[in-house]
């Protein structure tokens, strides 16, 4: 326990040292950007905003689940900056790999929200057919890019989580063979 609250900057400096095993200015800057954006919600939310790619297909998605947030409450360019800063840190290790994947994923999914809104706008006008097609193709490519990014870290791969669930089902009393499939 501490006698007084630490300054956020000092805490983040200690956190990045503990997380990555080295002091790194770019990593500290990345976390400072995340602290001032995605981790700095100043309003009450029932749930966080969710990746638009997880919603049922629609041009007017405002949430993925019934409890999800309806908008992004932070400057999305700060997450882009966080991903760039963490990449520039050029560290190694599983924590660094996880965070770099996660920050990049968040920046790309935030862009997906913006891109879908622009696709919706372009779809409303016959004069925007070419813009619509370009944005649609960019959106579909963004999904593929996200899949490729997430496949670089086992923590973001579905197989890891389904295997863990199957392992738990094998241990639990009262499960049937069908439960374990």
What is the predicted function of each stretch?
Residues 1-181:
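Substrate-binding groove of N-acetylhexosamine-processing glycoside hydrolases
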């Amino acid at each position: 326990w501490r006698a007084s609250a630490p300054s956020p900057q000092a805490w983040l400096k200690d956190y990045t040292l503990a997380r990555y095993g080295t002091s790194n200015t770019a990593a500290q800057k990345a976390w400072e950007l995340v602290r001032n954006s995605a981790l700095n919600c100043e309003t009450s939310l029932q749930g966080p905003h969710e990746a638009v790619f997880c919603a049922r297909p629609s041009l007017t998605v405002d949430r993925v689940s019934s409890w999800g947030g309806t908008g992004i409450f932070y400057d999305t360019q700060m997450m882009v900056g966080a991903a760039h800063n963490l990449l520039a840190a050029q560290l190694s290790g599983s924590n660094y790999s996880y965070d770099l994947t996660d920050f990049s994923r968040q920046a790309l999914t935030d862009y997906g929200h913006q891109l879908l809104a622009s696709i919706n706008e372009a779809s409303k006008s016959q004069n925007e057919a070419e813009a619509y097609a370009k944005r649609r193709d960019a959106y579909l490519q963004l999904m593929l890019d996200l899949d490729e990014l997430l496949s670089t870290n086992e923590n973001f791969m579905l197989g890891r989580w389904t295997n863990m669930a199957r392992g738990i089902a094998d241990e639990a009393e009262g499960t049937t063979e069908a439960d374990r499939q």
